UniProtKB/Swiss-Prot annotation:
<protein>
    <recommendedName>
        <fullName>UPF0500 protein C1orf216</fullName>
    </recommendedName>
</protein>
<feature type="compositionally biased region" description="Low complexity">
    <location>
        <begin position="115"/>
        <end position="126"/>
    </location>
</feature>
<dbReference type="Pfam" id="PF15546">
    <property type="entry name" value="DUF4653"/>
</dbReference>
<dbReference type="InterPro" id="IPR027812">
    <property type="entry name" value="DUF4653"/>
</dbReference>
<feature type="compositionally biased region" description="Polar residues">
    <location>
        <begin position="62"/>
        <end position="71"/>
    </location>
</feature>
<comment type="similarity">
    <text>Belongs to the UPF0500 family.</text>
</comment>
<feature type="region of interest" description="Disordered">
    <location>
        <begin position="1"/>
        <end position="144"/>
    </location>
</feature>
<feature type="compositionally biased region" description="Low complexity">
    <location>
        <begin position="84"/>
        <end position="93"/>
    </location>
</feature>
């Protein structure tokens, strides 16, 4: 959008246009394929502009908040030079941007860092096994056979101790039973001896009683004939 500067003819649309009725000179294309009336009016991306002064935004004379804006380059040799459209880039900043963009390494360019990083990080680029995936079997540990033998030896000792305890318990029970049987037999012998003694005592008592009865009968027999006489 451009603002119409005061003093321009109604028929002219851009700065530097000739008034109506005048013959226009032969138009020649510039390097940007734009047909312009003069060399100064050619849009050469402002090459050759003195001072490369930044354009200044100027409002129209009506002071109304419109979108029409015009660029004014102070110090320009002629007023007929066409100002660039709104949003055009300054030619001075254009090479800097191009240079800054050139410093960024594109994917198609190889400045040596990509190959070196690939060579250095070749180990890291290889896929590493996940945490949950099982690793391959490592070298056998020489201590494992000795540990297994020690564990087996301990297990054998524990079993032997348990067997010895069971045997000791069985032997103890058998000894207790034998002792109990011997005690019972001893009691039986004692009982038999006591029964024999009692029988002898009873026999002695019976014999003594018989003797006493016989003696009493003999004493009573001689006294009876004397009484009859």
């Amino acid at each position: 959008m451009f603002a119409i500067q005061p003093g321009l003819a109604e028929g002219g649309q851009f700065l530097g246009d000739p008034p109506p009725g005048l013959c226009q000179p032969e138009l020649q294309p510039d390097s940007n394929s734009n047909f312009m009336a003069s060399a100064k009016d050619a849009n050469e991306n402002w090459h050759g502009m003195p001072g490369r002064v930044e354009p200044i935004l100027r409002r129209s004379s009506s002071e109304s908040p419109s979108d029409n804006q015009a660029f004014q380059a102070p110090g320009s040799p002629e007023e007929g030079v066409r100002s660039p459209p709104e949003g055009a880039e300054i030619p001075g900043a254009e090479p800097e941007k191009m240079g800054g963009a050139g410093t960024v390494c594109s994917p198609l360019e190889d400045n040596g860092y990509a190959s070196s990083s690939l060579s250095i990080d070749s180990r890291s680029s290889s896929p590493e096994p996940a945490c949950g995936t099982p690793r391959g079997p490592g070298p056998p540990d020489p201590l494992l056979p000795s540990v297994a033998q020690a564990v087996q030896h301990l297990q054998v000792q524990e079993r032997y101790k348990e067997q010895e305890k069971e045997k000791h318990h069985v032997h103890l029970v058998m000894y207790r039973r034998l002792a109990l049987l011997q005690w019972i037999r001893g009691l039986q012998h004692q009982l038999i001896d006591q029964q024999a003694r009692l029988q002898e005592s009873f026999d002695t008592i019976l014999d003594n009683r018989k003797e006493l009865i016989r003696c009493l009968q003999q004493r009573a027999a001689p006294s009876r004939p004397q009484d009859q006489a």
